[in-house]
Amino acid sequence: MGTAFKKFCIKFCCCCCCEDEDEEEKAPLIGHDTLDYFDREAKKRRDQETNLWSEPGDPSHSERDDDRVLYKLLQCRQQTQPGSRGYRRLSIDIEAMRDVRREVRDKWKMILENLGFMAEAESLLNVSASASYDRMRNAASARSLLQTLHTETSLFNSKEPPPERYLFILDRLIYLDAAEDFVAKARRFYPPKDDDEEEESNPLGINLPLLLSRMNQNISGGEDEDEDESEPDD
């Protein structure tokens, strides 16, 4: 619509053709509901990438002890005064748990790249919150291989059940006919260790009962933490 015609309509017409066109031009191409959906999905992806939940399909993060502890630590930190001593302690515990999970993931990535999946390793290791056991092609075989990796290698912390997220990755490797090769490489690169060797080589090992105890102390002593905030750190 030309500028002169717009001026004519504004001056002499009672219709709202100009305003309607302007409104149409300003109308968003994507609705708010769609934008909210994309935002939620992006947050879920960031949450999975940051925390590497052992049970990715559990939105409550309560089915496994390690997920439950990490989730409670995150919730407790949200309710703690930023910058306080309690907040810093919680942040250290949270990062310690994340570091252990990242270490396991890095081991898997190294083996995948050694098998030739240089470009595909990240995609193979990505497990979304929508992961479903019903969609797995070889669930029984994948679980058997996961147990083998748990008992016959040092990929995981042998004192805890192996993270379920790697069940989905093994299912993909079975489909690609690379699962047996992966297990063979894992046996070679990460042979099993006894308890003493594991403690020496894994300084980031997580004591879940101790973390829970410290977290409960932080909750019950929240007022004291605010007072301690004014004291100089040692």
From Swiss-Prot:
Annotated Pfam families: MREG
Transmembrane regions: none
Membrane association type: Peripheral membrane protein; Lipid-anchor
Subcellular location, record wording: Apical cell membrane; Melanosome membrane; Lysosome membrane; Cytoplasmic vesicle membrane
Transport recorded as keyword: yes
Segments of skewed composition (Acidic residues): 222-234
GO cellular component, one term: apical plasma membrane
Keyword line: Cell membrane, Cytoplasmic vesicle, Lipid-binding, Lipoprotein, Lysosome, Membrane, Transport
Main location: membrane
Region (Disordered) residue spans: 215-234
A GO molecular function held by the record: phosphatidylinositol binding
Sequence similarity: Belongs to the melanoregulin family.
General function of this protein: Probably functions as a cargo-recognition protein that couples cytoplasmic vesicles to the transport machinery. Contributes to retrograde melanosome transport from the cell periphery to the center. Overexpression causes accumulation of late endosomes and/or lysosomes at the microtubule organising center (MTOC) at the center of the cell. Probably binds cholesterol and requires the presence of cholesterol in membranes to function in microtubule-mediated retrograde organelle transport.
Protein name per Swiss-Prot or TrEMBL: Melanoregulin
Taxonomic path: Eukaryota, Metazoa, Chordata, Craniata, Vertebrata
